[in-house]
Amino acid sequence: MENIEIVSSGKHTLHGLNFYLSYFDDVAKVLPREHYCFIVGGWVRDRILGEPVGYNIDVDFLTTADPVELAKNFAKRIGGHFFVFEKRGFLIKRPTIASVVLHLPPYRYRFDFSPLKGKDLEKALIEDLKERDFTANAIAVNLDDVLSIGAKQTIVYDPTGGIKDLEQGLLRPVSIENLKRDPVRVLRGFRIAIEKNLQLTEDFYEFVKEDPRIVLKSAVERITHELFKIMKEKTAHKVIRELYEYGVLEAIIPEIGRLREVKDQGEHHIYPLDEHTLKTLEYLEQVIEDRAKYLSAELLENFGKKRVLGEFTDVELLKWGALFHDIGKPQTFAVREGKVTFYEHDKVGAQIVREIGERLRWGDEATEFVAKLVRHHLRPFFLREAFKKGELKRRGMANFWRECGDIAPHLFLLSIADAMASGDEEEDIKALMETIAELESFNRNEMKEEIQKPLLNGDEIMEILGIKPGKIVGILKKALLEAQIDGKVETKEEAIEFIKRSTKNLKPLDEG
């Protein structure tokens, strides 16, 4: 931590350059002369901790100006995207936040502006800080001080002892009442503690144990936003494990609680279902970090570039896929002839994901992405078994790419993590890697356009055969595509002949 001097109770001094960001000059230029602006929260905390500025930059401001107008003018000046975020709840002290988001890859900036009201400026600031979540986030500096030339003695406002707590490695709630007023702060506390390597204080844990469901009093959109911020962490598995152990995750997603019902997963697993699930997420984060070791640069070209829910990506969705990949197992658990089975748990799981996504208001795009991962998470293992037997055919590989090509890198990474968390033998993991390599090679060299769709469409088939719409048309299209994949049909003329030959055997299926 930087060298901080104590001025008086609740005040310290620190060199202003510690807090500087070039965009602060732009804020100052659109701030009306008669108004003030303070930098608060995580930006101040991280600079005091001496952390480097990363690619994801979040800054919170308190201002005596109209935050909406200030944010609008700031967004216009820097070319950012402006929006207003409304917090719900009668106890929320800052219900309206004006935000500006700017993406300059690889950097992502978010600036939030909240109102500061009161005749006595310093008193209003101190009162606001005392209403915040954790002492580490209840620290502020004046924007003017940060921008002053040679600001060696910038005053740092710290009425709740946040700096002392940071020095001791603690993350302490400003008060339990503040957590009760805005319970989504519970999720934030677990995340920040892991992210910043801080120890949450005992009063926080006692509060959570007393009522893990209190988080549900917050708006579902804010819960979802905080959960996705957790998944954005490189070590999200640590936060998720704590949320699970303290009952918070189950309160939000009751389906997660059912995982502990399955103690025995059968011969292919070394952990109970809940531990296997948490381990899969843990291994996945390692695999994501080392992804270039497992997949080609070509396949990874667009990995992490799909945007969802504003500031999040397909990487977070992949982590949700890991957490939910076996969510259908409790409902499909059975013992048949002495063997544990989970028939169609992938299909059941995909439907459960859709229900969760709708409840947490993920939106269709994010929900369907995760549902598709869950629905097809077994595909790489089926293909591995075919590969081990020497039965991996063109048709199977082509079907995979045609049906799962958009999520292929995600499925591959998930399958590797799933195998590790299942305790697969080294030779089986090696076979999985070889299967993935074979699939990649096929996609790169042989997955031509003509085997991704039939050479004849439905209208053409009906015209050739002189038939009306019916099941036979779909059956013939599928048979034609499989013949193309197998290399038996390569031209349109061959396709016509194939359809004519196939009609005699298939025609009875269209009757009745």
Swiss-Prot record:
PANTHER family: CC-ADDING TRNA NUCLEOTIDYLTRANSFERASE (PTHR47545:SF2), MULTIFUNCTIONAL CCA PROTEIN (PTHR47545). Changing G363Y: Reduces the CMP incorporation at position 74 of the tRNA, but does not affect the CMP incorporation at position 75. Its cofactor is Mg(2+). It catalyses: a tRNA precursor + 2 CTP = a tRNA with a 3' CC end + 2 diphosphate. This is CC-adding tRNA nucleotidyltransferase. Adopts a seahorse-like shape and consists of four domains: head, neck, body, and tail. Gene3D superfamilies: 1.10.246.80, Beta Polymerase, domain 2, cca-adding enzyme, domain 2. Changing E221A: Does not affect CMP incorporation. Changing R222A: Reduces CMP incorporation. InterPro entries: HD/PDEase_dom, HD_domain, HDIG_dom, NT_sf, PolA_pol_head_dom, PolyA_RNA-bd, tRNA_CCA-adding_enzyme. Mg(2+) binds at D58, D60. GO terms for biological process: tRNA 3'-terminal CCA addition; tRNA surveillance. Changing F85A: Does not affect CMP incorporation. Pfam families: HD, PolyA_pol, PolyA_pol_RNAbd. It comes from Aquifex aeolicus (strain VF5). SUPFAM superfamilies: Nucleotidyltransferase, Poly A polymerase C-terminal region-like.
